[in-house]
Amino acid sequence: MDRPITTLFMLMSLDGKISPGASDALDVDKDFPKIDGLKEGLPQYYEIEQTTDLWSFNTGRVQEKMGVNQKPYPDKTPVSFVLLDNNHLTEHGVTYFCKKSQVFVLITSNKDHPAYNIKENNLHIIFQEKLSLKDALRELKSSYGCNKLTIQSGGTV
């Protein structure tokens, strides 16, 4: 296979709705722990999340909602991150992921993305005039050795 094996990791309600990452009305990390009937299942969700692949795909939009553009820089983790983003991450947000990731790959169609101002050895940018996840997945495997990828994107990809 010329692309990574992908696993979709998501929260979904019984009526089939995906987590509220597609809107700003609710935030999984801030609001779900306060909702009776939902908060009881969160420990299981986070426990399973820790067993996912060492490559994680998400979006800049979701990460902006989680506050990475302002959060203090984290310690390095064993996880490599792939983010799809055109205009949600700031230079601070990009640097946040460089500090956190073994390898950080940004997929963008924005020629002026703030990531182009960051000089970190583990930062790689896949520029695409028109987004093609198929081509991006192939490049992740061939250029960066990504064999397994967990996708968590708040229902927006």
Residue ranges and their predicted role:
Residues T95-Q102, L106-T108, A115-Y116:
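A mid-sequence interfacial segment
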